[in-house]
């Protein structure tokens, strides 16, 4: 009997559990699509619950969230609760997908004095009792801000900088808020144009602005797109696209959707919604598109204070005088700008790489802080920076009071901006701000080749291994071959040396600092009036005619090749020339004796001898006997036999003295022409021109 009673009790409770779960499943299963569209609000005012300063205006059919009075709040919610949780196929409960679209206008009390903004909100109640004005946006207050029991999610449209003195980095931004007014995600207001360029605009512009918010319940991804309705296209890329798993902790079974807004002390705006559509649950819910031509006209600024005629006359008179002064000031500024030709749009500004905003670079380099300097020279200073969109960068700020510096800037834009090769430093973009010229490169973490060859004590006590050196040599050769023969125009680098070779994290060589590069149409003569380059790497013909060529680049490469193998600088002493020294050992049959002693016996003798002989061939005193970079690479890859070195290879004592005196004469008489350049990414100090580094 007792056993039967126990069985009956168990079956009764089991039946109740089934009924409970079935009831819950039934309720959640009823999470049918909630969908509404408001083209204006006058005819649908019974569907909207407004409180505070919020009201539906019958004269213009708009939903006004706040007027321009100070320290007011307003809320407007869809009157019916919306089910936002549903059962999945695996009987789990998730937040439904939903989509909303609305068009809004913000009219500040006066230019620069608008505030504070508004939110699109998911709330457990159709109002926000106790919510405060100003930075709390009519959503929360100082007591409950950050409380998990709020169950509030908001997309904020903030026009004033700084919640709690800085949690919000800047005004005119969009943020995602979870139970808190400190945004978890925050983006400055921009849209992406048809060419995927960023274009900024203002929330308080007074023009209609469209917002599209879409949440995918399966991937928990929220997309927010915002742009002025004057555009004839919808941006393909949203401003915010983030996974927001936090919603599952915030959203209850039923929530209210709507808006909150607030003004502050001395900062106030009227916030309007022209139209609103919403759709949730179901399969791929999509809010209806709001056709601008069907929406009520946007609001206009008006003055309802009824100024007397004398005040109006005074205001009009002052306005006319101010306008005349502004026109005169504008004419004066334009005249000065034309005279100074400041920030004029050159042809190369249109045709070449992406232009960065100066403000972004200013912030990325911590306001060009001295501690972020990683190099000097080459007519400018190089800063380390970090962009949130693309990561670490190097910013080369070119000295603006140097005509040579301007020419260098244009040369780099012309060359690097259109070059693309794995052994060339990548130029991300450029910026011209007032009198400042800036180039933005990839940041190369290992710095320059000379820092790896000569740094004392050696980095981490490790000597650059032979196999790495040999690959670096071939990498530099490959980059020069691309410049000389494989691009659409011939590019003469004119300053090949270790400090202009960058080494990336995989120890690949990248040729950089094209500040002295010049483009030559194929078949034309070079027209150079000044000697440029670095002592020790300059071909002898440069001291006679100053004409840089691919052959002079080959000479500099030859010196650099010998330097990498030997671990010696090209002119370490008064009468020491590295190429002559190597040639002497080659003549005596002991060429491997010149290999860097720090390598010990850890090098490939065949490769070392091959590299040294190729280096000597490149250093021939006569340009016509030097190999092309294509032949150099074939020699190094073992695809061609290396020829014998010509018996007229070297310099006589008198020609060597003439070469040295001519170079020193040029350097001392025209310092601006010499290239004591510094790699845009190296973190070592610039070397003196006398040492050739």
UniProtKB/Swiss-Prot annotation:
Pfam families: Lectin_legB, Pkinase. Keywords: ATP-binding, Cell membrane, Glycoprotein, Kinase, Lectin, Membrane, Nucleotide-binding, Receptor, Serine/threonine-protein kinase, Signal, Transferase, Transmembrane, Transmembrane helix. ATP binds at residues 374-382, 396. Its EC number is 2.7.11.1. Residues 368-642 form the Protein kinase domain. It is a single-pass type I membrane protein. It is found in: Cell membrane. One of its GO terms (molecular function) is protein serine/threonine kinase activity. One of its GO terms (cellular component) is plasma membrane. It comes from the Eukaryota. Residues 1-22 form the signal peptide. Residues 23-311 are extracellular. Glycans are attached at residues 21, 44, 71, 89, 141, 180, 223. The chain crosses the membrane at residues 312-332. InterPro entries: ConA-like_dom_sf, Kinase-like_dom_sf, L-type_Lectin-RKs, Legume_lectin_dom, Prot_kinase_dom, Protein_kinase_ATP_BS, Ser/Thr_kinase_AS. It is an enzyme of class 2 (transferase). The active site is at residue 495. Residues 33-279 are annotated as: Legume-lectin like. In the C-terminal section; belongs to the protein kinase superfamily. Ser/Thr protein kinase family. In the N-terminal section; belongs to the leguminous lectin family. This is Probable L-type lectin-domain containing receptor kinase VI.1. It comes from Arabidopsis thaliana.
């Amino acid at each position: 009997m007792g056993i039967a009673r126990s069985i009956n009790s168990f079956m009764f409770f089991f039946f109740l559990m089934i009924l409970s779960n079935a009831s819950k499943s039934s309720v959640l299963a009823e999470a049918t699509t909630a969908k509404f569209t408001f083209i204006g609000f006058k005819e649908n005012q019974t569907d909207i619950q407004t409180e505070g300063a919020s009201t539906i205006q019958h004269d213009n059919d708009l939903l006004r969230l706040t007027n321009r009075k100070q320290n007011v709040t307003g809320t407007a919610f869809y009157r019916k609760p919306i089910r936002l949780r549903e059962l999945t196929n695996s009987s789990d409960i998730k937040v439904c997908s939903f989509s909303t679209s609305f068009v809004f206008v913000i009219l500040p009390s006066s230019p620069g004095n608008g505030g504070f903004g508004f939110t699109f909100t998911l709330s457990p109640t159709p109002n926000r009792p106790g919510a405060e004005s100003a930075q709390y946006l009519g959503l929360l207050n100082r007591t409950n801000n950050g409380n998990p029991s709020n169950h509030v999610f908001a997309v904020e449209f903030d026009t004033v900088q700084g919640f709690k003195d800085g949690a919000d980095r800047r005004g005119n931004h969009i943020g995602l808020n979870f139970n808190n007014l400190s945004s978890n995600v925050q983006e400055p207001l921009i849209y992406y144009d048809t060419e995927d360029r960023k274009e900024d605009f203002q929330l308080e512009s007074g023009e209609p602005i469209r917002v599209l918010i879409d949440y995918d319940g399966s991937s928990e991804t929220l997309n927010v797109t915002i742009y002025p309705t004057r555009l004839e296209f919808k941006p393909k890329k949203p401003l915010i696209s983030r996974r927001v798993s936090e919603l599952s902790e915030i959203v209850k079974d039923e929530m209210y959707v709507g808006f909150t807004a607030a003004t502050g002390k001395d900062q106030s705006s009227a916030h309007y919604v022209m139209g609103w559509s919403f759709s949730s649950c179901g399969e791929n819910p999509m809010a209806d598109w709001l056709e601008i031509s069907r929406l009520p006209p946007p609001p206009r600024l008006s003055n309802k204070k009824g100024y007397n005629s004398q005040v109006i006359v005074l205001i009009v008179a002052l306005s006319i005088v101010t306008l005349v002064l502004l026109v005169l000031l504008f004419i004066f500024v334009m005249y000065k700008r034309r005279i100074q030709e400041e920030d004029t749009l050159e042809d190369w500004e249109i045709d070449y790489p992406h232009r960065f905003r100066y403000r972004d670079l200013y912030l990325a380099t911590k306001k060009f802080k001295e501690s972020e300097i990683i190099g000097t020279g080459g007519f400018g200073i190089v800063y380390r920076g970090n962009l949130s969109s693309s990561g670490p960068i190097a910013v080369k700020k070119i000295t603006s009071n140097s005509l040579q510096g301007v020419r260098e800037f244009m040369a780099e834009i012309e060359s690097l901006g259109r070059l693309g090769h794995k052994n060339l430093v990548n130029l991300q973009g450029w910026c011209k701000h007032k009198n400042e010229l800036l180039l933005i490169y990839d940041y190369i973490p290992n710095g320059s080749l000379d820092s790896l060859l000569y740094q004392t004590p050696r980095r981490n006590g490790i000597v650059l291994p032979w196999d790495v050196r040999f690959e670096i040599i071939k990498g530099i050769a490959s980059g020069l071959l691309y410049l000389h023969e494989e691009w659409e125009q011939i590019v003469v680098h004119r300053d090949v040396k270790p400090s202009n070779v960058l080494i990336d994290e995989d120890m690949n060589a990248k040729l950089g600092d094209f500040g002295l590069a010049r483009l030559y149409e194929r078949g034309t003569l070079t027209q150079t009036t000044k000697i440029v380059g670095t002592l020790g790497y300059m071909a002898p013909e440069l001291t006679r005619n100053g004409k840089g060529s691919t052959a002079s680049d080959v000479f500099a490469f030859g010196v650099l090749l010998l330097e990498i193998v030997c671990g010696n600088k090209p002119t370490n002493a008064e009468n020491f020339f590295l190429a002559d020294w190597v040639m002497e050992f080659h003549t005596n049959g002991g060429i491997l004796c010149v290999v860097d002693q720090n390598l010990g016996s850890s090098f490939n003798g065949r490769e070392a001898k091959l590299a040294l002989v190729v280096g000597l061939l490149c250093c021939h005193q006569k340009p016509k006997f030097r190999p092309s970079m294509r032949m150099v690479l074939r020699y190094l890859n073992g695809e061609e036999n290396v020829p014998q070195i010509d018996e007229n290879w070297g310099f006589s004592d008198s020609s060597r003295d003439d070469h040295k005196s001519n170079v020193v004469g040029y350097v001392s008489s025209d310092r601006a022409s010499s290239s004591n350049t510094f790699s845009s990414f190296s973190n070592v100090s610039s070397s003196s021109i006398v040492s050739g580094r």
